[in-house]
């Protein structure tokens, strides 16, 4: 099945995605950091709050939604469909161990974006048959901010992923 992603998002809106959480902000507030990133050219924001309670995560998501909606910048919520729906976010991003894509798509409104993390070329190929709007190729390089990752793809791996799918890659 080919994703009707063109109806939900333009690839240009995914050209520079900020993936952040409140812990990455240091002394500054999350909205302050996100606003500065958008002013610097960020075209999409993914909120990851792995350590926050549901209440706190929802409050942060709503604050970012209020900031981003007037600017036309999509807000994607990491892992939590419930938070994405309650905050009226533009989408949700799921990893390999999260809810299956088909189940998520059944729950989500048809206009809501669905991103999926891929860690191997086989997963990229499998994604061609899934109703996802974009793929998160993770990680391209080693990172200290996320330690539970597969080995880095590197630039050659990223190039290979690009050849395996027409879906937008982030």
What is each residue range found by the language model?
Residues 141-143:
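A short, flexible beta-alpha/helix-coil linker loop
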């Amino acid at each position: 099945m080919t994703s009707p992603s063109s109806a939900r998002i333009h690839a240009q809106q995914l050209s520079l995605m900020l993936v952040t959480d409140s812990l990455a902000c240091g002394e500054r507030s999350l909205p302050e950091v996100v606003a500065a990133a958008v002013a610097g050219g960020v075209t999409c924001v993914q909120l990851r709050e792995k350590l926050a309670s549901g209440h706190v995560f929802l409050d942060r998501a709503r604050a970012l939604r209020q900031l981003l909606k007037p600017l036309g910048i999509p807000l994607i919520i990491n892992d939590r469909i419930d938070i994405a729906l309650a905050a009226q976010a533009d989408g949700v991003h799921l990893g390999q161990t999260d809810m299956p894509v088909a189940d998520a798509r059944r729950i989500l409104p048809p206009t809501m974006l669905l991103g999926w993390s891929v860690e191997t070329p086989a997963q990229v190929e499998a994604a061609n048959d899934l109703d996802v709007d974009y793929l998160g190729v993770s990680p391209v390089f080693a990172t200290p901010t996320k330690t539970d990752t597969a080995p880095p793809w590197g630039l050659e791996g990223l190039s290979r992923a690009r050849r395996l799918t027409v879906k937008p890659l982030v």
